[in-house]
């Protein structure tokens, strides 16, 4: 089960009633934060999910409304007792940005690893205590993909594929004459040399089961590569800076999207659900424009600060 919270929904500047656009994903107690503008720490405190268990921070781009909250968050994570490494990913140039912002935190009780991405994937293994990089495709249970999009600064979109472990098959293990003492290790994707014979996980596991895909796209024009990148997403979170179709010229000029454009991406990407966020400060009632999205992609909705969504694996 995966819980997701839209922490903030506005772009450009924090508002009295809206925090800056940011989203927190909770996978079995380990957390991924997407963007960290001014006030994100306060929004996180409101939902009560804690700071210590944030293992991965994904920054879409360097603009202040997506980064200025980082120094405070990095500090409070240390004050919360964090000692394990924290990974920050973002587009090329993010190392300089994060290191510059973080000059006020010279002494941290944990390692801060910063990785610059360019349309590539990272694999992670998530357990109850941490989320760490993993090279073994069989052992990893989270695949993070990135796509460079079109904005006034280098900007990345992200997709998160949470893998699901195959079911253990007693019938298959027995048929393949796998010794019972090896079953649990093989179920945990280990390869074992036992009595001069190699035993592999496929000897005891059924076929792979479908995981959950979450895609996050913000601060971009609707470029042609996005539908394939978000293909078959269970949840597509996308910017909708402008609700009205009449604001298309503003969207083009400022390299953002209208609700209708975002919905078209969801339709072409064959997504299950679209949640719109990152609204212009001038868009005081984004829900009044939701029909512009629904006319294109019916399962569209408008986010609000503190929205929590639960996604479950389907057998």
From Swiss-Prot:
* SUPFAM superfamilies in UniProt: Metallo-hydrolase/oxidoreductase
Record: residues binding Zn(2+) 1: 61, 63, 151, 219
Chain coiled-coil ranges: none
Which keywords does this Swiss-Prot/TrEMBL entry list? Answer: Endonuclease, Hydrolase, Metal-binding, Nuclease, tRNA processing, Zinc
Superkingdom of the source species: Bacteria
Where in the sequence is the active site? 65 (proton acceptor)
Q: Family assignment?
A: Belongs to the RNase Z family.
Name of protein: Ribonuclease Z
């Amino acid at each position: 089960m995966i819980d997701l919270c839209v922490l903030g929904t506005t772009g450009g500047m924090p508002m009295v009633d809206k925090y800056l656009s940011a989203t927190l994903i909770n996978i079995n107690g380990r957390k991924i934060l997407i963007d960290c503008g001014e006030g994100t720490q306060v929004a996180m405190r409101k939902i009560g999910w804690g700071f210590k268990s944030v293992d991965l921070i994904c920054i879409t781009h360097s603009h202040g409304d997506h980064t200025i909250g980082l120094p405070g968050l990095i500090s409070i994570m240390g004050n919360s007792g964090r000692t394990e490494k924290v990974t920050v990913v973002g587009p090329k140039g993010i190392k300089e940005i994060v290191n510059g912002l973080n000059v006020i935190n010279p002494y941290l009780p944990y390692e801060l690893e910063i990785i610059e991405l360019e349309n590539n994937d990272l694999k992670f293994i998530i357990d109850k205590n941490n989320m760490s990089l993993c090279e073994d495709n069989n052992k990893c249970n989270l695949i993070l993909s990135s796509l460079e999009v079109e904005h006034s600064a280098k900007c990345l979109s992200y997709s998160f594929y949470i893998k699901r472990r195959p079911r253990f098959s007693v019938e298959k293990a027995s048929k393949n004459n796998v010794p019972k003492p090896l079953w649990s290790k093989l179920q945990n994707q280990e390869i074992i040399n036992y009595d001069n014979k190699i035993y592999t996980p496929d000897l005891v596991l059924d076929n792979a089961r479908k995981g959950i895909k979450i895609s996050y796209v913000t601060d971009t024009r609707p470029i042609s590569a996005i539908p394939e990148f978000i293909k078959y997403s269970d949840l597509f979170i996308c910017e909708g800076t402008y609700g009205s179709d009449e604001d298309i010229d503003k969207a083009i000029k400022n390299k953002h999207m209208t609700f209708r454009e975002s919905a078209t991406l969801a339709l072409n990407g064959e997504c299950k659900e679209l949640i719109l966020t990152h609204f212009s400060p001038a868009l005081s009632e984004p829900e009044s424009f939701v029909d512009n999205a629904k006319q294109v992609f019916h399962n569209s909705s408008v986010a609000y600060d503190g929205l929590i969504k639960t996604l479950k694996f389907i057998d």
